[in-house]
């Protein structure tokens, strides 16, 4: 069960009615020590890379898929909302919206830190490439007798039934489909992520988080997809590949991604953004999600908050740094350099 929910409930209530400048909330969060993360790292034998770099924890951020507009973003930043950073969605295969594009300078000038997100291919709960059934509505014409006595007559009616049929191949212009999950597509999407991040003017060393939604089963082909994505970003050398992942898949994905870092001669640990609702509290460190390697913890999903007269549907996160994608490392630190 979730513990110490008081501050989180206060934030939700303030979001509904609009609150003051929020300075006391931010300062109380920032006052927490990162020693908790270091203890968790020591206890599990894992590293807490971003937590190790700071002694001020608990930087609140939000993410929302559709850009709320400049006015809303500025109103939140200046109107008491406790959020120091925001997700920044690149146009990507499973998130083609371009609303965030070109907003890097606008948002940073407002004082926002940024977490760059690239929503790659997903399994959508099935085995990529395997035949699967989808519900299809089928219409048919049938005869029916209506009326009584001398007025009884035959009419035609259309009946719609839902049946399961084998899914067709992806449309020629499709960009997002479980059947696209493959190593070659991972490399293609990795190159696309790098190109789009560079086009928006992000500095070398910026972390790009590949969004991997929860998978009850993690197919080998998906593991090859995201490893190829990571290898491609590493090989380019300008940016750092990170991962957004659900806690259910986090350990396996982390081990896979870390192996790609080491194979590329990289000494850093990959930045991870872990989603888990249970136990979330805005005063906690990301590593308290249960994975000492977590740099960001997403703990509240699909809520609406209103600050300074602007309502936005958001997910709530806590990061070890004020700008999760700005990790403060050079883009190509290699073993032996």
Which residues fall in each region the model found?
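Bacterial signal peptide processing site
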Residues: 20-22
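Substrate-binding cleft of extracellular glycoside hydrolase catalytic domains
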Residues: 49-225
């Amino acid at each position: 069960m979730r513990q110490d929910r008081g501050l989180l409930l206060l934030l939700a209530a303030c979001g509904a009615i609009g609150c003051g400048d929020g300075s006391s909330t931010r300062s109380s969060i920032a006052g927490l020590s990162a020693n908790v993360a270091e203890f968790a790292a020591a206890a599990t034998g894992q590293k807490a890379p971003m937590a190790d770099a700071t002694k001020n924890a608990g930087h609140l951020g939000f993410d929302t898929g559709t850009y709320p507009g400049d006015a809303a973003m500025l109103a939140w930043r200046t109107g008491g909302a406790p959020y120091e950073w925001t997700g920044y969605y690149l146009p990507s295969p499973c998130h083609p919206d371009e609303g965030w594009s070109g907003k890097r300078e606008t948002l940073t000038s407002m004082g926002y830190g940024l977490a760059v997100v690239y929503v790659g291919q997903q399994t959508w709960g099935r085995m990529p490439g395997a035949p699967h059934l989808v519900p299809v509505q089928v219409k048919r014409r049938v005869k029916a007798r209506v009326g009584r006595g001398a007025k009884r007559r035959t009419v035609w009616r259309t009946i719609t039934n839902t049946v399961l049929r084998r899914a067709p191949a992806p449309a020629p212009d499709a960009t997002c489909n479980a059947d696209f999950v493959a190593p070659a597509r991972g490399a293609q999407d990795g190159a696309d992520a790098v190109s789009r991040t560079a086009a928006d003017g992000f500095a070398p060393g910026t972390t790009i988080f590949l969004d991997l939604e929860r998978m009850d089963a993690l197919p080998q082909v998906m593991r090859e997809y995201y490893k190829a994505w990571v290898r491609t970003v590493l090989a380019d050398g300008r940016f750092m590949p990170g991962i957004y992942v659900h806690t259910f898949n986090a350990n396996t994905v982390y081990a896979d991604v870390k192996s790609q870092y080491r194979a590329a001669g990289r000494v850093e640990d990959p930045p991870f953004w872990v989603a888990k609702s249970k136990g979330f509290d805005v005063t906690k460190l990301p590593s308290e999600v249960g994975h000492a390697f977590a740099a960001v913890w997403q703990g509240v999903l699909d809520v609406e908050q209103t600050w300074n007269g602007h309502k936005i549907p958001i997910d709530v996160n806590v990061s070890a740094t004020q700008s999760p994608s700005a990790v403060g490392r050079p883009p190509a630190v290699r073993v032996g350099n």
